[in-house]
């Protein structure tokens, strides 16, 4: 193709400038930039130059110095005979931790002690560098020499915060405590990270201990409760922190309990057990809902619930959704909490049959037994037109089903097998939609017809074929499911499978996938069903099939795997062809592609390109071309924006700073490389890593 000569000329021009040593010209500052610098360092510009202890301001950028030199009196500036060579030596000595050289250069009075180091080296003032790297001796030397102790980073962190975030030693903190640093400006989020001794020291009356921080407007007590830091919570309470303070969601520290010990401390300090957040939930509601989260110590949750109830928490409090703690205990299937609430006079706020159905849906056997009444088995439908069999099929707890079958033995099997919903789905259809294979087997034993059709003429096999659930298809065929039954549009379950494979083939147009499709087509036509379903199961072994199973498959088969979209099948096909590992696919769910969360999409492709097996199987060029064509058909995303993130991590960053010739050169080379290799136009970007060109 025709080379971009203009781009090549610009690259050559920059290289010649770098070779000749000609410095980059700094951009002209705006009046706003000049004013901002003057305001920041106003105190330094009015120093008494006779005072031997001079605090030198951070370096005035050259372009600012030129603009302000006409208005500033020479007598107001520090009396320093600045030497650029000595300044370079000073910064080098800081990096090398050469204390003797540093002392020598400071005494020469030819350096700016608060000067920022060159980008890529220090990137901060020498004192900030000393604090971040935990070098207390160097920090003391610089402070004694007049370094600015109130200097802040670009994101507003002072020296104390830098020490906290970088886990500095006690010596560094002790040094900072002896200075007159402004602690009032400290970020309380950083303060909460301190170990308890320093945390206690810094909570001085000058600080407003009830100051809220972060986007949720939380106090130190909120943070201590959330992290279960007992000592910090006690110290905060001893300093008269407001235990009833609410964050932006209306939650107090008591809503964030992790252990009963924290509950004891907060309750002793007067925390209100009836405080409600913006969803109307009390600390008891929140504690019970915690039990439904992964990686939670369920014993701790039980102890918290017990502690709250003993302290007077209302077990019948209703949130804005109309739920009581008892109903949440039923929904999360926690029998111990359910029994504890019943023992402490928890009442039903809803219809008993409705709660009974909730217990069935969550598979809560204890609640099912407690709520059961004989008349519930007389085929009663709830307000949604469903009866108890629907909820058993959804919940999938065979012990619950066995219990109700025993209770229903007088009525026989006829009532059990009569139920259909508005779409004429039987409990077997519903169980298949939710991936509940064991319940399907139990229903069949009770006399349900495994080949029953719904209003669309579909059997359970049609549903499983649409969900790409090959393992269940295989097992149901063994149980007698008929593969030749057609739905109302004349399609069998195997016809549905073929349609899905054709959809993938059209999207990717890859020879390997086409061969696999043809092979599966032959297998299907010859009737070797076990081989066909085995292939389907292997096809789903990329991790996505397992993910659906783990999530209960509720509703996802209908929304994510419909043939009109085929997005999930497209990316799953890529996973199969390129031998991606399970973790890569599990990090990428197709519906995220259509949301604003482009980051996960970009991360997916970064991981894909880092995958050695993928690189060995398929070239980057062909993959990028495939992806580019796909995005052209789906203009919801700007392909240039995402393509810029398709390279291995660390190559290309976010924005180009035109005053840096080296970075500009790398960015231009990147632009040229992409235009030549992929016939694409990359946005101008700054390169994080100089090893750009492969």
Swiss-Prot record:
Keyword hit for Repeat: yes
Record key words, sorted: ANK repeat, Repeat
Family annotation (InterPro entries): Ankyrin_rpt (IPR002110), Ankyrin_rpt-contain_sf (IPR036770)
Stated name of the protein: Putative ankyrin repeat protein RBE_0921
Disulphide-bridged cysteine pairs: none
Phylogenetic placement of the source organism: Bacteria, Pseudomonadati, Pseudomonadota, Alphaproteobacteria, Rickettsiales
Key word Nucleotidyltransferase present: no
The ANK repeat ranges on this chain: 122-151, 155-185, 216-245, 249-275, 279-317, 321-350, 351-382, 384-413, 423-452, 456-485
Highest taxon of the lineage: Bacteria
């Amino acid at each position: 193709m025709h080379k971009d000569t203009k781009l090549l000329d610009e690259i050559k021009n920059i290289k010649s400038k770098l070779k000749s040593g000609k410095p980059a010209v700094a951009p002209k500052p705006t009046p706003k930039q000049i004013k901002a610098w003057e305001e920041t360092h106003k105190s330094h510009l009015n120093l008494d130059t006779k005072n031997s202890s001079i605090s030198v301001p951070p370096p005035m950028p050259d372009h600012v110095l030129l603009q302000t030199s006409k208005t500033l009196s020479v007598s107001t500036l520090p009396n320093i005979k600045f030497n650029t060579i000595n300044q370079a030596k000073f910064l080098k000595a800081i990096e090398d931790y050469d204390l003797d050289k540093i002392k020598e250069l400071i005494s020469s009075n030819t350096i700016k002690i608060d000067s920022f180091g060159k980008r890529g080296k220090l990137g901060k003032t020498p004192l900030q560098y000393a604090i971040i790297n935990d070098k207390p001796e160097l920090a003391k030397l610089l402070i004694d020499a007049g370094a600015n102790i109130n200097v802040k980073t670009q994101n507003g962190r002072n020296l104390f915060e830098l020490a906290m975030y970088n886990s500095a030693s006690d010596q560094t903190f002790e040094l900072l405590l002896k200075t007159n640093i402004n602690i009032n400006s400290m970020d309380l989020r950083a303060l909460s990270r301190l170990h308890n001794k320093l945390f206690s020291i810094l909570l001085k009356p000058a600080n407003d201990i009830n100051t809220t921080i972060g986007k949720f407007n939380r106090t130190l007590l909120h943070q201590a409760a959330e992290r279960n830091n007992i000592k910090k919570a006690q110290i905060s309470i001893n300093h008269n922190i407001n235990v009833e303070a609410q964050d932006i969601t209306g939650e107090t520290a008591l809503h964030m309990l992790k252990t009963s010990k924290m509950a004891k401390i907060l309750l002793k300090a007067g925390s209100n057990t009836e405080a409600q957040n913006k969803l109307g939930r009390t600390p008891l509601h929140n504690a019970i809902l915690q039990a439904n989260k992964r990686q939670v110590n369920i014993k701790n949750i039980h102890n918290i619930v017990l502690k709250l109830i003993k302290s007077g928490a209302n077990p019948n409090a209703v949130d804005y959704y109309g739920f009581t703690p008892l109903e949440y205990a039923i929904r999360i299937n926690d029998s111990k909490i359910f029994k504890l609430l019943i023992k402490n006079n928890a009442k039903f706020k809803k219809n008993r049959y409705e709660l009974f159905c909730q217990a069935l849906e969550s598979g809560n056997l204890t609640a099912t037994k407690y709520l059961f009444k004989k008349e519930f088995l007389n085929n009663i439908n709830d307000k949604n037109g469903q009866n108890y069999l629907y909820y058993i099929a959804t919940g999938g707890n065979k012990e619950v089903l066995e219990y109700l079958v025993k209770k229903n033995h007088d009525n026989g099997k006829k009532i059990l097998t009569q139920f259909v919903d508005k779409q004429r789905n039987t409990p077997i259809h519903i169980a298949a939609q939710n991936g509940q294979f064991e319940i399907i087997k139990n229903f069949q034993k009770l006399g349900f017809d495994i080949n029953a059709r719904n209003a669309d003429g579909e059997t359970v096999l049609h549903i499983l074929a649409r969900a790409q659930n090959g393992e269940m298809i295989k097992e149901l065929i063994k149980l007698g499911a008929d593969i030749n039954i057609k739905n109302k549009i004349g399609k069998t379950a195997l016809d549905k499978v073929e349609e899905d494979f054709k959809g993938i083939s059209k999207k990717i147009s890859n020879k390997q996938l086409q061969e696999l499709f043809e092979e599966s087509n032959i297998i299907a036509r010859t009737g070797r069903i076990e081989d066909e379903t085995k292939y389907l199961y292997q096809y789903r072994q990329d991790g996505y099939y397992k993910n659906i199973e783990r999530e209960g498959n509720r509703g996802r088969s209908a929304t994510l795997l419909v043939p009109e979209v085929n997005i999930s099948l497209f990316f799953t096909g890529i996973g199969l062809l390129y031998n991606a590992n399970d973790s890569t696919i599990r990090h990428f769910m197709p519906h995220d592609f259509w949301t604003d969360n482009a980051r996960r999409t970009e991360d997916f492709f970064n991981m894909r390109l880092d995958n050695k097996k993928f690189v060995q199987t398929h070239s980057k060029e062909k993959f990028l071309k495939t992806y580019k064509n796909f995005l052209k058909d789906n203009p919801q995303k700007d392909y240039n924006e995402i393509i810029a993130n398709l390279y291995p991590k660390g190559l290309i960053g976010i924005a180009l700073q035109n005053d840096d010739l080296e970075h500009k050169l790398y960015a231009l080379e990147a632009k040229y490389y992409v235009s030549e290799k992929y016939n694409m136009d990359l946005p101008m970007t700054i390169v994080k890593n100089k090893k750009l060109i492969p």
